[in-house]
Amino acid sequence: MKQYKELCRHVLQHGDEKGDRTGTGTISTFGYQMRFDLQEGFPLLTTKKLHLKSIIHELLWFLKGDTNVKYLQENGVRIWNEWADENGELGRVYGAQWRSWASGDGETVDQITKLIHDIEHNPNSRRLIVSAWNPGEIDQMALPPCHCLFQFYVSNGKLSCQLYQRSADIFLGVPFNIASYALLTMMIAKVTNLEPGEFVHTLGDAHIYQNHLPQVNMQLEREERALPQLRITRDVKSIFDFTFDDFVLENYDPHPHIKGEVSV
């Protein structure tokens, strides 16, 4: 995807060397935006092969409101293992905030259910927002949310999504996040009888870890290939009824996978 390559080049050309929480070191810039027209194909990176199975299962896990890695591990997904405690718990991470945000009166808010309701009944609303950044519960999270707030927008029968990502690991995280929120947009469009529009990805601290520089440069040398298509195979009515088997990826022809170490 040219948008991703342009991001990589921008950070390499204009970024500053910075230290970070993990001690690895980064090249970083602040404030960057990419746009993806979901009618032009599913934005799954082609300059390296991505594990779509992990992307789908993680998103379904978020939507369940789950915060234990058991479901992920049962489905061969290990991306959260480094942060889980001995019981597999991660605390009040994404799923908890999306589905049971703790309000000040002792009640909880199911932000996803409210979002779907508002898209269906008040599509012109400028409040179609879900936040995972809950300052009162940051200390209860194994990892504070990197992709922390997203907003939907309905126009001309199309549903678009903008994500704000406070911390963006360009080699490992960002390709995953692009695909995940594009998929979420498609799923919500399906259950609200809309067409997918754009996915807009806004990055705060956009960084390349020092130990990922060879991998990023390898991707920049690879030619982009045509985007695949992702098809939803069933007429799903509720966002919570999707299963892994409801998605089929077609015409995905990526370059080989490139390994990179996760900075914890």
UniProtKB/Swiss-Prot annotation:
Gene3D superfamilies: Thymidylate synthase/dCMP hydroxymethylase domain (3.30.572.10). Keywords: Cytoplasm, Methyltransferase, Nucleotide biosynthesis, Transferase. GO terms for molecular function: thymidylate synthase activity. PROSITE patterns: THYMIDYLATE_SYNTHASE. It holds the Pfam family Thymidylat_synt. Catalyzes the reductive methylation of 2'-deoxyuridine-5'-monophosphate (dUMP) to 2'-deoxythymidine-5'-monophosphate (dTMP) while utilizing 5,10-methylenetetrahydrofolate (mTHF) as the methyl donor and reductant in the reaction, yielding dihydrofolate (DHF) as a by-product. This enzymatic reaction provides an intracellular de novo source of dTMP, an essential precursor for DNA biosynthesis. Belongs to the thymidylate synthase family. Bacterial-type ThyA subfamily. This is Thymidylate synthase.
